[in-house]
């Protein structure tokens, strides 16, 4: 200000107003930032496999109610569904999932190997971090006209088997491993298992691309005498095509198909959602969640819930992937990679 000049009260007022305005803006911005962070800490993204959308829709509602009751806080769970392996790639490439819930352990291992989930993810939750399972069974046409009861019936002359290509779908990989393991469970050697699986695929008229394609081939195109699929798909078939179209046949032995889950460490470290993500996956083991799984024909780990739904989940002897194959990762290398056992045993058109 020039010497002898009186201060301009309006200039001072303007400076004060401007400073006040800036302060309000700063406070508002800070509030929004903190509020957004707080909201993010009560919001999860579950990236899951395609056919689990109905189960998780019901589970999320149950978890939100449980979380509100026990903590007094609201929580919002968003879902993303697609093929399990495609989802794993999306998360690896940057999709900010807080948790992943897949249907094959190889997809979680892929993320673990890339540092996205913990290396020891399978030890973070009970049952090797698989709160639910399914198994492989046979769907036959109503009345079971070919009298198919067990694995040996699938290699008989004149029996056509519909199955997913094990190189393109987890459904197919589990079917292949179940057939192989069924021989081993009866005391057979790997050589005898390979011989059986080779005969098995000679009765496969066409390999389906995926589970839904296999169902379409069997029920819409009317090809085959038996469809090998997940137990959890029986409800879907009845819902889409109507009850009475097929009969479910439980073989003497089958494989345990695990549904693994994991916290995405990369995301929760950034968002501060680690405790919430763990609580979300922990609650999958609760009786309420296990009941919801049973409702959707997903086999619960809880023996009590399983027994309660014994009319739906028939008793069946099961073996794990680890028992004969080490892991799904090892099975992939030995059996399903190019030049592996499957390529040696399967010849299209024969």
Label every model-predicted segment.
Residues 268-350:
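Extracellular/periplasmic juxtamembrane helices and adjacent flexible linkers that interface
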Residues 47-49, 140-142, 160-186, 200-204, ...:
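Short beta-strand->loop
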Residues 41-169, 310-311, 343-350:
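N-terminal segment of the mature folded domain
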Residues 143-149, 168, 181-189, 267-275:
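Short helix-loop capping/hinge motifs at secondary-structure junctions, enriched
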Residues 130-134, 197-201, 208-209, 241-274, ...:
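Periplasmic-binding protein-like
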Residues 186-252:
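Ligand-binding pocket segment of bilobal, Venus flytrap-like solute-binding proteins
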Residues 36-40:
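Sec/Tat signal peptide C-region and signal peptidase I cleavage site
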Residues 16-27:
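Bacterial N-terminal signal peptides that target proteins for export
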């Amino acid at each position: 200000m020039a010497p002898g000049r009186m201060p301009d009260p309006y200039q001072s007022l303007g400076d004060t107003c401007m400073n006040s305005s800036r302060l309000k803006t700063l406070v508002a911005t800070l509030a929004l930032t903190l509020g957004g962070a707080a909201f993010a800490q009560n919001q999860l993204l579950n990236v899951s496999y395609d056919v689990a959308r109905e189960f998780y829709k019901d589970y999320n509602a149950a978890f939100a109610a449980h979380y509100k009751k026990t903590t007094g806080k609201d929580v919002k769970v968003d879902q993303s569904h697609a093929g399990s392996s495609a989802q794993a790639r999306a998360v690896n490439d940057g999709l900010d999932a807080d948790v992943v819930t897949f249907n094959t352990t190889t997809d979680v291992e892929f993320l673990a190997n890339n540092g996205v989930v913990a290396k020891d993810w399978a030890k973070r939750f009970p049952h090797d971090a698989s709160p639910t399972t399914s198994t492989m069974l046979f769907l036959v046409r109503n009345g079971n006209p070919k009298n198919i009861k067990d694995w040996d019936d699938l290699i008989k002359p004149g029996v056509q088997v519909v199955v997913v290509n094990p190189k393109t779908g987890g459904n197919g990989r589990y079917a292949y491993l179940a057939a192989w393991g069924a021989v081993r469970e009866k005391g057979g050697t790997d050589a005898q298992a390979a011989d059986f699986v080779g005969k098995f695929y000679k009765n496969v008229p066409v390999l389906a691309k995926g589970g839904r394609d296999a169902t379409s081939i069997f029920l819409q195109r009317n090809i085959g005498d038996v469809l090998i699929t997940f137990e959890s798909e029986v409800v879907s078939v009845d819902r889409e095509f109507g009850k009475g179209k097929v009969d479910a046949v439980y073989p003497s032995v089958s494989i345990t198909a695990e549904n693994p889950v994991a916290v995405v460490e990369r995301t929760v470290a950034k968002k501060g959602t680690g405790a919430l993500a763990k609580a979300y996956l922990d609650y999958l083991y609760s009786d309420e969640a296990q009941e919801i799984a049973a409702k959707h024909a997903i086999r619960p780990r809880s023996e009590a819930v399983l027994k309660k739904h014994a009319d739906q989940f028939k008793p069946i002897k099961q073996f794990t992937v680890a028992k004969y194959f080490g892991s799904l990762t090892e099975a992939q290398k030995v059996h399903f990679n190019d030049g592996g056992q499957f390529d040696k045993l399967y010849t299209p058109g024969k």
